[in-house]
């Protein structure tokens, strides 16, 4: 009987902790780089340094709202991937997770075309995160 109580307690604690730890924590994501959007319509290039390869990326907009018109990811092998985001991001919003075709890919650069929303709120920061 004592072993059954101990076993049930262990199962209960394990179940409790499994709900407390998110499966997609920031620990799984690596910071790739960021850009500060100028006022109005702006095109920026984020050059990616290092030898890391990623399966997925996502972006997070902070400091001010931003309308992302277009985003292109250029890989080391010369291929290009157009990412259709066309979205208004509020301060603190994240994009969906963007999967790369073919698994692990080395990123050479990411080009953004965006427009600042609400100039009085300041310049938006666009941060790119990658997952292996």
Language model features by range: what are they?
Residues 1-24:
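Bacterial Sec-dependent N-terminal signal peptides
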Residues 20-47:
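Transition segment at domain starts
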Residues 33-35, 82-90:
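Solvent-exposed serine/threonine-rich low-complexity stretches and specific carbohydrate-binding patches
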Residues 38-68:
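Short, surface-exposed binding/anchoring microloops in extracellular/periplasmic proteins
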Residues 39-41, 90-95:
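Solvent-exposed, conformationally flexible loop/turn segments
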Residues 44-49, 94-102:
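Exposed aromatic-hydrophobic patches
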Residues 53-59, 102-118:
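Noncatalytic modules at the cell exterior or secretory-pathway interfaces
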Residues 63-85, 121-131:
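Short, surface-exposed beta-strand/strand-loop-strand elements in extracellular ectodomains
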């Amino acid at each position: 009987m004592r072993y059954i109580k101990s076993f049930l307690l262990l199962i209960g604690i394990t179940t409790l902790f499994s709900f407390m730890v998110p499966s997609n924590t920031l620990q799984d994501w690596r910071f790739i780089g960021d850009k500060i959007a100028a006022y109005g319509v702006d095109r920026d290039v984020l050059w990616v340094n290092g030898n890391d390869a990623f399966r997925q990326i996502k972006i997070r907009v902070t400091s001010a709202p931003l309308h992302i018109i277009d985003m292109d990811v250029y890989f080391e092998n010369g291929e290009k991937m157009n990412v259709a985001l066309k979205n208004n991001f509020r301060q603190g919003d994240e994009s969906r997770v963007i999967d790369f075709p073919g698994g692990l890919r080395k990123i050479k650069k990411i080009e953004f075309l965006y427009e600042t929303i609400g100039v009085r709120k300041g310049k938006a920061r666009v941060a790119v995160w990658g997952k292996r």
